[in-house]
Amino acid sequence: VNDYEMMLNSITWTSFLLYYFAPEFFFPNIFIYRFFDLHKIADMFEIDLPSIPKKSNYKARCMYYWSLCEVFYRFRAENELSPAELCAFLYDFAPNFMPQKEADVPQPTQHGVSVD
């Protein structure tokens, strides 16, 4: 197993540990499961994110977290946020601030009744 592939598989837990021990520099990264949400937040609040590495480049994908830490460190410093306030911004305020699209339920193509 490639070391970077293994690290990538544990990046969420590693990010929580890094945040626990050094919250000034790291943030808990749960966006690995909600990557599109991170980009919507960045677009909404004009945060320049680093370019996304190729899926096959495990080293670059691992290092992407470090780049995100640098970006959010600067964002936190510029906006005078504490580490806890950055987490509140990323995981509570920003997702709830973004307009939600209401999904239209498509009309059924067939009508039927099921009788037991």
PLM features: what roles do these ranges have?
Residues 12-17:
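Conserved beta-strand->loop/alpha-helix structural units within folded catalytic cores of enzymes
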Residues 28-116:
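C-terminal accessory module of base-excision DNA glycosylases/AP lyases that mediates lesion recognition
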